[in-house]
Amino acid sequence: MTMFVDSHAHLDGKQYDSDREQVIARAREAGVQTMVAIGNGDGPPTLDAGIQLADKYPFMYATVGIHPHEARLAGEASYQTMEQLARHAKVIAWGEIGLDYHYDHSPRETQKQVFVRQMELAAAAKLPIVIHCRPSDGSHNAWDDCLGLIQNQWARNGLGGIMHCFTGNWAQANRALDMGFMISFAGNVTFPKAQPIRDAALQVPLDRMLIETDCPYLAPVPHRGKRNEPAFVKETARQLGELRSLSMNEIGERTSRNFYDFFKLAEIAESKVPAR
């Protein structure tokens, strides 16, 4: 069976409380070999959310980090907690972190300060970072600030990272690529009005591309409007395949290999990972 990797899933969300086991089983049946449980939780009180899942499932990895929405809640205690959590064997990245000027749930200056502090902590932990970047409607403001901070505070360390759920243009993608980042596409690449994302996806080198669901959000066409889940990552692969004149399975195989190579992980053998 062709393998797929969902490189970004919020499987701790309450949206899955009634059927989390079944959701994960469906993903495995669909060929999703590996999932990354993003460890933002609901902010500082639940920063181990991803680790709890990764501990339970041998085919999951985790991240740790404070999302820009909750930046206003960050403090020394939460930084110390993340430093400890980052040592866990299944934590492979720090994130998602970055800037969100669309919702502005935290003041922008606070977002920047927390972003920079987390880049410092990630560098000390020698972990790549997973970036959330969302500008105000019709603006590039968050992209300008986010890429500038990465250039000044991160790029030189060579650890790189992932531009998660990429929504920018090719110029922004290219700048991120130059700083050692992978570009990850989510279900919104299938949306009718997402032509700028598709234009960027046409130009991102195949060996720098990842796929994700960002579930439970952004369910791809034909599931749009429903709760997203890791099994649906195949629809993102299908759309990218159509753009690049490749099959869904070819995109799945290529992006899976990219994931394992970037994180220096051995491919998880199916025989060692029973479906749950």
Role assignments for model-derived ranges:
Residues M1-R276:
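Mid-domain alpha/beta scaffold segments of enzyme catalytic cores
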